[in-house]
Amino acid sequence: MTNKANLPSNESIMNTLAPEQKKSKANAQPFSVFVPAAYEDPHVYRQVEELLDQVCQVVSPVWPLKDWIAVNPYAGLSERSFHESRDYLRVFSKCELLPSMDHFSAHYQSGSFAESHIEAALLENSPGKDLSQKKADVLKALQTRLHTGDASKQTMPEKSSLPRIATIADRLSAHGEVDWTEIVKDEIGKHCSAHYDEGQSTWASPWRNLPLYQAWRNKAKIDRGIEILGLTGFRHFVDELPHTVEATIVHLLQRLNIPRALWETFLLAHAFSLPGWSGWTKYQGLQTDPTGTGRMQFDDFRGLLAMSLAYDVAISEAFLFEVNWSSVLDHQSLSLMDSDNDCKSDRKILLRAMEIAYRDDLLAKLPVRELTTDHVADEDFEEPTNLATKPAVQMAFCIDVRSERFRRHLEQVDASVDTLGIAGFFGLPFEYVPLGQSSGDTHAPVLLSPKFALREKSSPCVGDCATSRNDTAEKQVSVRNGKKLWKRLQTSAVGCFSFVETIGLFSGFDLATRLMSPKFRNSLRIKHPSKLHDVEATPLDLDHLVEQGIDLDQQTDLVEGLLNSMGLSDDFAPLVVLCGHGSQTDNNAMAAGLDCGACGGHSGAPNARLAAILLNDRRIQKRLSDRGIEIPAETHVIAAWHNTTTDQIEWLDLDAVPASHQSRIVELQNVADAASHLTREERLPLLNESCTDSLISRASDWSQTRPEWGLAGNASMLIGPRELTRGRSLDGRVFLHSYNQTTDPKGAVLESILTAPMVVAHWINMQYYASTVDPTLFGSGCKTIHNVVGQFGVLSGNGGDLQAGLPNQSLGCGLKMQHLPLRLQTVVVASRESIDRVIAKHANIRNLLQNGWVHMVAIDSGQKYRYHSDGSWVQLRTENTSRAESEWQVVGGTC
């Protein structure tokens, strides 16, 4: 008996598919005119290659655990508008970009936003029109939800049953009793886990050296697992598949009788049915181009599509399950009205209303004045009373939102301290290679490739110092090798049982210590957190930089770029501190996600150490002087490390500090300790703790699923001078990047900030947004059921899709969400003309702003302007920004 699933008209393709179906980017040929020729035909081959590349472009990569960073899951959609992307994704997936009405109702009830913000949101899209009826409809929808449901419920909306274009496994699962979707996920997950294993498994896959598809094909031909579950004849089916990925994909699509106009959409449905493994195989392709030539081979991603398609075809043929694809094409040109169209429209408005409410609150905290060299303030500006005229210390932090609280309290405790904000890799993109290893980790944003390798070395000093440090280096190598040997003994097939019988008792002592004496273990960790992160165990090998072609001139270029990016080219304080940051947790597989994103998910301490060493080099200072940057002889630069879990500062390489600065260091340490205590006190309510010691204990609590909130709550980025925000609480929600337009007449520094740090901040913002709004697709579920797989990722339970996003514990506690899903609001203190030049030059920045992925406000000559999607600027009144939108004074606009 044949099961025919004729798609109803409301499952047709939306008009948003039209651009993708009409034209290919390479040769402007519509996919629907594919001739039924052999795959070997060069013309067909080129079109298939282009088709697969376009599918791959929509998927965002997933980084391994050791380098895990926040990634924008929607990065491949930036050429579309934010709301169009929502409609586009829902054609082939259950993806959701908008929070639920329950979410908006709860925040409206709590006063997070008001009617004026709803009105402003409506006027943004329809200026000058009478929108009173639409506003009344939105308010009615909010009130209805308040009275009919629990407005404190989840942030994400309810899922629909199936997307319009779904996999065969999804459709059969919806019509039958067997969940073939989960079975296929488990089968693919089982194979991918073994194929990419990095040493966790005792027995490695015999086909791990083959490409993913070929390895799967060899295994699937002899694996009876899925046949036992009901898919009979699968081994024979796989044996008859073509040997190459591209040929297999074409063969399987034709076997399903899918019209060529739907190939791309159907492949996207398969990619988004496994977002984790799709992202992981996309990452594998990125690693095929380490030199940045742009010629990457995404063979494994294509292999994953072929594998998923194979299961679909086998299921379709085994159960005689067919889809009437012609009904989809029949309604392809129709304008589809979603069943949730009105609700969706309301949620679009309410999302923007909440963003405007936050923007108003942020801008209200900033002084309204023209930032000039003579600091002429208007009546609304109050100069902080504790601001010193000449700083004794200048301390640079990462732009990470967790630095905002600490910087504020540091300046509050001591007015002679000035803080600056810069990307935490300090402009030094390198691979950090620990002593005794041949390779290391990249300490740079993932958008950049490392320019050189920074190696640790044995100490060149003599006497007891050399003996001590050489011993330390040897111990590091021995400890690493010992851990590997110990792990092999624990997991070996022969020794694992005897290991438990003989050594297990001793492990009980460590278990008892963890449970009964947490304060003792905590004191050991907190006193020297840098040693846990290997940030100053051994000196750095600068001679190796020269061997790689990074001579003094290039080293000078690097630190000159660093100083210019910070806006620190004169008026140096006697003591300059470069403070990297990292997190300190125990038993946390996703620990890298709490470290410095600008350092690729690693500690920023090595970057700070290298930058300090280079800036103290008199030869480099001489070259900087020749370039117009004079570092006084009495200025000394040191490195530090901000522990974001405990909010403590670890001071690095203090043995290199001259005697003239020792007393200053001691004073600064006392100031930092006081600031640490104040910062922890401010964070207490957020983590529901009663004393600051509890926050410190979280760093060593192996049962703690939420050691810190990370970057939860991030909502904006401010690019401007510190005087604009000094003494003002921004609630730890703002990326703060130092910038002074008066020292950047050509706009080069502004361009570098908008094209790099702002993009990284946007990625982080979108990762938190997506994991909050759509945790099923872009989150990673509950930490308590995570299992590390292959040392590179985590599974939720014992199989299925790779978990790609943030866990629930990083976003909220129970029904209370710590992260509020808002798109990034960037505030730039610069002229609109200079910003426009950057936007006009860089299409990716233009896409982010004009397509609604990022919002921007410029503070120009004391006035505030909002960037509009058409490239113009809308002036905002300072006392009531929302109401000012109704005036719509359009200014400028060159794009």
Curated annotation (Swiss-Prot):
Chain positions recorded as Zn(2+) binding sites: 398, 400, 581, 596
Gene Ontology CC, one term: plasma membrane
Cofactor(s) the record lists: Zn(2+)
InterPro entries xrefs: DabA
Domain of life: Bacteria
Keyword hit for Calcium: no
Keywords for this protein: Cell inner membrane, Cell membrane, Membrane, Metal-binding, Transport, Zinc
Molecular function terms, GO-annotated: zinc ion binding
Record's subcellular location: Cell inner membrane
Bilayer topology: Peripheral membrane protein
UniProt keyword Nucleotide-binding present: no
Family: Belongs to the inorganic carbon transporter (TC 9.A.2) DabA family.
Quaternary structure and partners: Forms a complex with DabB.
Function field: Part of an energy-coupled inorganic carbon pump.
Protein's UniProt name: Probable inorganic carbon transporter subunit DabA 1
